[in-house]
Amino acid sequence: MFNFLFNSSNQRKINSYAPIVKKINALEIEMQDLPDKVLRAKSVQFKSRLQNGENLDDILVEAFAVVREAGLRVLGLRVFDVQMMGAIILHQGKIAEMKTGEGKTLVATLAGYLNALSGEGVHVVTVNDYLAKRDSEWVGQIHKFLGLSVGLIQQALPKVERKLAYQCDVTYVTNSELGFDYLKDNMVLSMSEIVQNKFAFCIIDEVDSILIDEARTPLIISGPSEAPIEKYSRTKLLANILSKDVHYEVDEKARNIILTEQGTLFCEEYLSINNLYDLENPWVQYILNAIKARELFTKDVHYIIRDKEVVIVDEFTGRIMSGRRWSDGLHQAIEAKEDVVIQQENQTYASITYQNFFLLYPKLSGMTGTAKTEESELDKIYNLEVICVPTHKPLRRKEFPDLVYSNEYRKWEAIADECYDMYRVGRPTLVGTTSVEKSELLSKLLNQYKIPHSLLNAKPENVEKESDIIAQAGRQSSVTIATNMAGRGTDIILGGNPSYIAKSILVDLLIGKSSVKNNYKLQQLSPNTKISLNNILNALETDLHSVDFSMLEMEKKISIACEQVLTDDKLEIQLRKAYQMIFEEFETIFSKEREYVSQAGGLHVIGTERHESRRIDNQLRGRAGRQGDPGSSRFFLSVDDNLLRIFGGNKIADLMQALNVDNDTPMESTLLSKSLEAAQKKVEAYFYDTRKQVFEYDQVLNSQRQAIYAERRRILESSYPRDCVLQYAESTIDDIITFWLTSKENPEKFVNLNIKIKYLLNAADTFSISKDLYKDSEELKKWIIEQVRINYDLREAYLEQIKPGLIRQLEKYYLLQQIDNAWKDHLQKMGALRDSIGWRSYGQQDPLVEYKNEAFNLFIEMITHVKHTVVYAILRSRLMMKND
């Protein structure tokens, strides 16, 4: 029935969805006959049925049939059977693996709509702001047509609008914005500042990128700390005179530095100190970071210099990560290395990994083109099953064997030759590189070949054109160089993307203020079309000047004009005429190119290096052969590539030498392919172990985080925080008495209980505990607690006279302030513990067990500290004291 090969287990699951899809299809004609008003009213009926006891599975068939019809009316897109299957998988809280171009964005609307009917809100998560905005404006129209509200979270969105967006039925948001909002919500001082609602259902687009690639990187909210900047400058000079394999060793697999005993002694002598590991004056972390900056972090690969600042390049997407900084002093070490201004080191205020963040959702699902290779990890950590969905049309992509060269430069020459061959026959080519540096090297080679090409990497001048470049990467003879998966989410359509270019022209003309005459994209259009377009825009001038539209409002109007959604807005109707005019002419131009490019063999994808994960390689291959188009892919490698060098290059180099392969001849064999796959599996296993270890250690901190955040929320929601303060007071008095009883046994540490309690209560000099009470510790405790309550009542009455309700505000403020300060310090201690715990393995101890034990002790210390400081801060506050 389907044109895709699956293992029997996966196929059985797919077959089980066929009867449900058949029922949905049976309703198609009935839905087509319904007027818009009646179709919209279905949402109200579904909600009513849910309130009357039915569940989501009971209404799934009819709800999906409604969304399919709405999509056809609003966007002109009909949901295919395989897309229905993908949506059922999402609704069941699983991962749907769907190939590039199979319409994942549309699939999410079905599961999103169904689950939003429960009234609990659905979060659709994408990897960047552009995709979140595109999806909310495009497929979000289906939800709006059916009466649901659609929210969009963008990076600079103000708090009030952010809160409203989260209250919508369906909210489109990036993973980072979602995670940071969660952390910020757990740092607020009043309930009104919280923007997020209770988590219910989440659909993650490109789920593998977020749950696996970014799993090792925690989300961190930080502020300035007091770390001395001069240490970075001194250790930079020190690192430059240290010798590799003498003073330190480099573990490239773990991306770590190990100081040798000789190195430790040399550093101590150079710095004139006795102990690198002294907790009062630590130097070791600064030295290790300085060496890491030199050995493991390369300019234009891991970061770029922009405006005299070090800016991180995302190793998975090739995009720059503005505003993100490496933690634990690493960023400062790289700034010292590059001789730019060293910015103050930050202290962590709040943090969470994506692993633990997304596990907060009771129901989680995702979609991607590549997840099957990581299904074991997704199942073990997230309890997410991966199901491969068959393609709508047969896959026609040819995957040519890898070519391996004995040196790197010959590899790049061969890639340039391949680009030239494709350019000559008119086939579009997409070249995936692993860094800015490599993409620019290839660009220089192509310039020597006089091959016109587009360059897409993390450099700021290229980033802005990302979607434009990718959208037109399927045109005849086009050559596009892109770092990793830049442009992921934008389809490469053979011959070019007429709808994208038509919309981008309207944006240029109306928001970018370019003219019809000067817009380079319009050069291919006929003179008559240009004149007609100019006339429409001139007629719109009056409307545009009469109303002062914001850029956001103008973008919304353009989005509506470019889709099939019904509108009676005069401006949108005129914009639609302009869009149709541009679209139709480009469609004519592009359709001829599409036919030529298809016959020539379609898009050719070139990989320039095998990634650490087979999944990332598959993502690159997946750009070709979308929706049954022809296409091909090939990887060009050399024994100098990082993966082969670190994880098995010697075997391959020896094999090439044994076969007497010269520098110019590439090697291609089954044995070689097996060696490459073995190397990748080795890396995947290594990084899985790393992520698993991160998860296991973070689980310890996560349980503590949940306890602290729950206590914070309890205080925030409380209208009477006095109870909490008095609970803390009882606990504090208990600790004081226990300490006093212990001290009685040791004359050197004896504590005067009377002085302690007098100080706590801020009592008069005449305060005295009766000698009889000392005989019974329980009675003593009850009496002191009673004194605290009496004392508290008097001070509360005094404050109520000054301002009613002031005491409650003070209590809440002190409670939250002390919890936040203690948690901040606790995170620092936990970080230090995590960094040092690995050494325990040398003493035949399990580092994780030791970490759990010590983390528990630190947590108890922190809780005790919070209770004590809150009680002392409130009882001894000047505001709480009456001036007699």
Swiss-Prot record:
It catalyses: ATP + H2O + cellular proteinSide 1 = ADP + phosphate + cellular proteinSide 2. One of its GO terms (molecular function) is protein-exporting ATPase activity. The keyword Translocase applies. PROSITE patterns: SECA, SECA_MOTOR_DEAD. It is found in: Plastid, Chloroplast stroma; Plastid, Chloroplast thylakoid membrane. It comes from the Eukaryota. ATP binds at Q83, G101, E102, G103, K104, T105, D491. The keyword Cytoplasm does not apply. Keywords: ATP-binding, Chloroplast, Membrane, Nucleotide-binding, Plastid, Protein transport, Thylakoid, Translocase, Translocation, Transport. Its EC number is 7.4.2.8. GO terms for cellular component: chloroplast stroma; chloroplast thylakoid membrane; cytosol; plasma membrane. It is an enzyme of class 7 (translocase). CDD domains: DEXDc_SecA (cd17928), SF2_C_secA (cd18803). It is a peripheral membrane protein. GO terms for biological process: intracellular protein transmembrane transport; protein import; protein targeting. Has a central role in coupling the hydrolysis of ATP to the transfer of proteins across the thylakoid membrane. Belongs to the SecA family. This is Protein translocase subunit SecA.
